[in-house]
Regions:
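Nucleic-acid nuclease catalytic cores
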Residues: 77-78, 84-178, 190, 194-196
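Metal-dependent nuclease catalytic cores that hydrolyze phosphodiester bonds in DNA/RNA
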Residues: 1-105, 205, 214-220
Length: 220
């Protein structure tokens, strides 16, 4: 199945969806947004990474930024923060460049590495889009974390690719229905920029601050 362009979802929404389905729906279906220091800090970090005019050659590495990607099969479109091309026999030809070059997407994140797949899903989806666009295989990429100023290598395993596909199918279905799901609040809600928009709708008879305190006490 191939999605039409008007049905494409934002690729960056994968991270929101994996973190909290309700948060994703509030942003992408209800078009609600609120800033906190985390979102502002993250926006600043991405500002330089999305400089589409930037190109640089460092030895056997060619670096570009803000590269648009899409996949009709997945029904998403978005941008790679940084797309590097590493010279190698398994790569692809690039116009005006000698040899073969392996695409290597790099995504910028503000914090530290996570134990779940919230961050890696978005990067993997970028790679899957690039594979479709460039007719090549991309086995890995990297996440750069601003807090530790270091890259973490990410392998695009069959399991990670399957999770990307499964979540996108669910996202398309919710978007088609225009449905904002309810979720069980947790201590993670305390750091969410949308908590004052989200929680009052979930807890009509209870103060948000009181609910958050209870959720934090109940969570391990």
């Amino acid at each position: 199945m191939a999605y039409s362009e008007e049905d494409f979802l934002q690729l960056s929404g994968l991270q929101h969806f994996r973190f909290c389905r309700r948060r994703w729906a509030l942003i992408h279906i209800e078009h609600q947004w609120a800033e906190n220091y985390r979102t502002i800090d993250g926006a600043i970090l991405h500002e330089n990474a999305h400089d589409t005019a930037f190109q640089e050659r460092r030895g056997d590495r060619f670096i570009t930024r803000g590269v648009s990607v899409y996949s009709a099969e997945l029904g998403v479109s978005g941008q790679c923060d940084v797309l590097e091309y590493h010279r190698g026999a398994a790569g692809i030809p690039l116009s005006g460049k000698e040899g073969l070059w392996q695409p290597y997407p790099v995504e910028y994140k503000r914090g530290r590495p996570r134990e779940d797949t919230v961050d890696t899903l978005q990067l993997c989806a970028q790679a899957m889009c690039l594979e479709s666009m460039l007719c090549c295989d991309i086995p890995e990429g990297a996440l750069y974390y601003g807090e530790i100023r270091r890259r973490e290598r990410v392998s695009f395993t069959p399991e990670l690719r399957a999770e990307v596909r499964e979540l996108l199918v669910e996202m398309h279905e919710l978007y088609r229905r225009g449905y904002t799901p309810k979720v069980k609040p947790t201590k993670s809600c305390n750091a969410c920029s949308l908590k004052e928009l989200c929680l009052p709708k979930l807890m009509k008879s209870r103060a948000v601050s009181a609910y958050l305190r209870a959720a934090m006490e109940e969570s391990p």
